[in-house]
A protein has these predicted regions:
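Hydrophobic alpha-helical
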Residues: 55, 68, 72-133
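Short beta-strand segments enriched in small/hydrophobic residues
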Residues: 6-7, 35-43
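Structured segments of extracytoplasmic/periplasmic soluble domains
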Residues: 23-31, 58-61, 85-89, 111-115, ...
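Short, solvent-exposed amphipathic alpha-helices that sit
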Residues: 16-20, 46-64, 78, 82, ...
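Hinge/cleft segment of the Venus flytrap/periplasmic-binding protein
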Residues: 39-43, 47, 57-59, 63, ...
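Extracytoplasmic "Venus flytrap"
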Residues: 39-50, 69, 98-102
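Loop/turn elements at helix/coil->beta-strand transitions in domains of secreted/extracellular proteins
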Residues: 4-5, 31-35, 61-67, 92-95, ...
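Hydrophobic alpha-helical segments within soluble ligand-binding/sensing domains
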Residues: 9-34, 78-79, 128-131, 147-164
Length: 176
C-alpha cells in the first residue's frame, strides 16, 4: 500500500459493502437464489472496488442470482436508465437492485416507482438526505451511512496531535 501519508482516519468502502450485503442477505426478506441486479460506481475506482469486495466477502454474489451488474458512474440518471432496462428485461423475477451509492439508488427507485414495481427492494450507501427520507417512508430498503462527523472530529484530533509531534496511529477506523 501507499505509505506516503501521516495518518488515515475513516472507514473503508469494503466495510460499507459488507454492511449493505449483510442487510440484503439477512434483513431484506429476500430468499437465497432470488434474482438481483447490482449498480456499481465507475469501474476500477476505489469506492466501486471496495464495495464490490465487501459484497464478495459476505457472500452476496453467491447467495443471490445476480442477473446484471453494470456501472452508472455514481449518477442518478444513468442508474435510472439501467433500472428501467432491467425491470423490462427481467420483469417480476427481479427482486432487488443493490446500489453502490444512494444517488444511483434514488435513480433505481424512480425507475421502479414509474414501472409500478414497489416490490423491488433497493438500497445503497451514503446516507443521502432523500435516501434516508425514503427509508423512513418505506420506499427505500436501506442506506448505509458513514459517520462523517466522527471521521471529521477524529481527523482534526489526529492532525493536531501530529502537528504537536505526538505519537499517532497510522490507521484509525471510525465505526459506521
Amino acid at each position: 500500500g501507499d505509505t506516503n501519508y501521516t495518518a488515515f482516519v475513516g472507514c473503508t468502502d469494503q466495510e460499507s459493502g459488507e454492511l449493505l450485503g449483510k442487510w440484503f442477505i439477512e434483513e431484506s426478506g429476500l430468499k437465497e437464489g432470488d434474482k438481483v441486479a447490482i449498480i456499481e460506481g465507475p469501474m476500477g475506482q476505489s469506492g466501486q472496488v471496495g464495495r464490490m469486495a465487501g459484497f464478495e466477502e459476505v457472500g452476496l454474489l453467491d447467495y443471490f442470482d445476480v442477473v446484471a451488474t453494470q456501472t452508472a458512474n455514481w449518477k442518478r440518471d444513468e442508474a435510472m436508465a439501467l433500472a428501467e432496462d432491467w425491470i423490462t428485461t427481467y420483469g417480476e423475477d427481479l427482486k432487488a437492485i443493490i446500489c453502490e451509492n444512494d444517488d444511483m439508488g434514488m435513480g433505481a427507485l424512480s425507475a421502479a416507482q414509474a414501472a409500478g414495481r414497489d416490490d423491488i427492494i433497493i438500497g445503497g450507501v451514503d446516507g443521502l438526505e432523500d435516501a434516508v427520507q425514503a427509508v423512513k417512508d418505506g420506499t427505500y430498503g436501506v442506506s448505509v451511512l458513514q459517520d462523517s462527523a466522527g471521521q471529521g472530529a477524529t481527523g482534526v484530533d489526529v492532525a493536531v496531535a501530529a502537528a504537536k509531534g505526538e505519537e499517532i496511529a497510522k490507521d484509525t477506523r471510525i465505526p459506521f
